């Protein structure tokens, strides 16, 4: 068992009120202890490491200067908020991060008053902080809205939509741009730090305000010239002309690890009479932990690790990860097909597109955190005869639903959607669960929706999608490793809308979609042992349904149970509709649907989440037995 680090100063800080009692000269020590504590905690739990280490000093400075929680602090995405959680009364639970019943890996309203807004998806912070700022302004309450957003999240249009509407908030809105990728900032040094303090100071802002008021009395051409001169001078010295055009007062860039620079700038902005303000800070992912500094990508999200060596504890996988199966399969297909290309929205390794990119870099497009653009870009490619694969996590595809409908489905364009992280995802919890894609995609005309039962099926579905030119097609697959089945040397083109019988029975039929197939087979074994002959079908397609197969099973079995790892409104709803339309429920057939419960499940290990959801073999058996004991009105029959 690892020994917890000595943190004498941090031990005295239970809340930001305690932090504000410290002398400025003590903040450097506090930041060092906070960083050590975070490394120790994440080493025991796993989680997001690099991003949190990069904002330790910034977190200390924000809580020192601003009056949180009255000032509403919103961390974009939220995976960098571990230091924030430690300083806001949750240190005693920090070693429960992402564990069952423990702290969330993101900010969460129900967890603390210091988390005024739940985050996990990117680029929402400015909109939320603007909402807080305007609400307080209208209500006459004190309190600012503060958004901390990374430069990666600034690639999403939503951030600019918020900034374009922010002027009404005035000095109540502060945006802190955490530039940890050096993609925006010029070199940071003593001069830029001096300029940041200068242009955010009270005297400078006062003089600037006087100059502006005087310039308004000038003839219009002179007034415009004065305005442009001010912007040009500040733009030459400081950068940030884009943000000024959006109505923000820009300050920066400043060193996000230098508390002595951060404190005076934050104080100046806090006390500024004008606004909104944007502070540009430059930080380093993994700051203060050598392994993370040396390999930021490998230490963004980590398993449990040895704090001394940085070595992560990873169990040896018995089967390849689903995203790698997809990426490698697509790369092989593209060797023979120059029209295949891959699109990812800032998740190349998470989706397996990095495998494709190594072989076909000219046909790989990482569009950044811009799912809406990714889908319509893919539609344009498809309209011109390319075969685009848009690889997106299920939870993030939600952000582009209108584009799927309007730009792809209505025009019947053959965009291929590779939907990763389908189903429950474990430690990332409700915000990242892929629960809804079948429900919202299978309602759309023209769209084909498949779900892979294992990694071999994923190979077949990737190949099938590549050859499907008559309209859009989607295939979903889960997070993690496959089940260990051999991968086919030659992929099979699946017949659209046709399922398969895995085992034949006569009394009970289990209709599975996706990776619950393994549990359905276990349940069939248990039902057979009870004398209930059970058929198991892998439907493969949520849309179009294999109507012939389902009709045949419904007319030859007493009980039909659909099993899926998606929300209400998915496969089960479509099967029930089909049965109703064809009059197959009129003769006493017992149909039951099993799907995820109608709630947002908290984080836990995936197998425990599915057990809680009632989607494992014992639950399937129980559902069948209850169906056999009841008639369609729910009245128990005389026989067991």
From Swiss-Prot:
EC number: 2.2.1.7
Keywords in alphabetical order: Isoprene biosynthesis, Magnesium, Metal-binding, Thiamine biosynthesis, Thiamine pyrophosphate, Transferase
Protein's pathway: Metabolic intermediate biosynthesis; 1-deoxy-D-xylulose 5-phosphate biosynthesis; 1-deoxy-D-xylulose 5-phosphate from D-glyceraldehyde 3-phosphate and pyruvate: step 1/1
Cofactor binding annotation: Binds 1 Mg(2+) ion per subunit. Binds 1 thiamine pyrophosphate per subunit.
Cofactors demanded by this protein: Mg(2+); thiamine diphosphate
Binding site for Mg(2+): 151, 180
Description of how the protein assembles with itself and partners: Homodimer.
Protein name: 1-deoxy-D-xylulose-5-phosphate synthase
Chain's gene name: dxs
